[in-house]
């Protein structure tokens, strides 16, 4: 464990900044923004206008790798209908 910490500490500061930026951007692209896209789609799917629906398709296309990564945990099934008897 000490050798890993020593190896990281011996790297130049520019390299560490770039590594942290890559890690942060990848987390943002693969987990955080697709989570927000999911909640946005879930709340607006049945009431969206045609322009908003096109925007939703764009978001789904652009963040597809992250949505695919989150897909085992997401529920895209329609809501249960109320049937009046």
Curated annotation (Swiss-Prot):
The gene is ndhL. It is a multi-pass membrane protein. Belongs to the complex I NdhL subunit family. InterPro entries: NADH-quinone_OxRdatse_su_L. This is NAD(P)H-quinone oxidoreductase subunit L. One of its GO terms (molecular function) is quinone binding. The lineage of its organism: Bacteria, Bacillati, Cyanobacteriota, Cyanophyceae, Oscillatoriophycideae. GO terms for cellular component: plasma membrane-derived thylakoid membrane. It catalyses: a plastoquinone + NADH + (n+1) H(+)(in) = a plastoquinol + NAD(+) + n H(+)(out); a plastoquinone + NADPH + (n+1) H(+)(in) = a plastoquinol + NADP(+) + n H(+)(out). Its main location: membrane. It is found in: Cellular thylakoid membrane. The chain crosses the membrane at residues 17-37, 54-74. Its EC number is 7.1.1.-. Keywords: Membrane, NAD, NADP, Plastoquinone, Quinone, Thylakoid, Translocase, Transmembrane, Transmembrane helix, Transport. NDH-1 can be composed of about 15 different subunits; different subcomplexes with different compositions have been identified which probably have different functions. NDH-1 shuttles electrons from an unknown electron donor, via FMN and iron-sulfur (Fe-S) centers, to quinones in the respiratory and/or the photosynthetic chain. The immediate electron acceptor for the enzyme in this species is believed to be plastoquinone. Couples the redox reaction to proton translocation, and thus conserves the redox energy in a proton gradient. Cyanobacterial NDH-1 also plays a role in inorganic carbon-concentration.
């Amino acid at each position: 464990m000490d050798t890993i910490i020593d190896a990281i500490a011996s790297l130049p500061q520019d390299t560490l900044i770039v590594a942290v930026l890559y890690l942060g951007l990848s987390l943002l692209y693969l987990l955080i923004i697709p989570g927000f896209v999911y909640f946005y789609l879930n709340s607006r799917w049945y009431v969206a206008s045609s322009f908003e629906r096109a925007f939703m398709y764009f978001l789904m296309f652009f963040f597809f790798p992250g949505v695919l990564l989150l897909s085992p945990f997401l529920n895209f099934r329609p809501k249960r209908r109320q049937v009046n008897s």
